[in-house]
Amino acid sequence: QQSGDGWVLIGDAYGFIDPIYSSGVYFALKSGELAADAIVEGFARDDLSGTQLGSWTTEFDAGTQWIRKLVDKYYTNEFSFGQFMKKFPHHQGNLTDLLIGRIFYDGAGDIFQDMDPAMDRVLGKIPRD
């Protein structure tokens, strides 16, 4: 539960993201910023319910899902980011965005259109090319 009447979790208390990438502090601050907006709006509406105070999490989760997917790929020994980038160099900018925490925009997860099938191939879930 991320929020309740009169309280809300932010930062690592809301959702820890593996520190393998240096963007963890940014995500903690971003969650605080989004939660602060929900709190200010709650005061303006005289609504400090858990629903109002947690309204920021949908946007946050939509962005951080891409980092969680990237971390999952990182810890899969069979997957090689180097080999993936050689095959799909057009994703270099997207990978850079993910690594620096630029994830709150449409298209942030475009790399996974190719990365997910590549992962499935190395794990033998689908035939190799």
What does each model-identified segment do?
Residues 40-129:
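C-terminal helical "tail/cap" subdomain of flavin- and related membrane-associated enzymes
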Residues 1-66:
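Conserved mid-domain beta->alpha element of the FAD-binding
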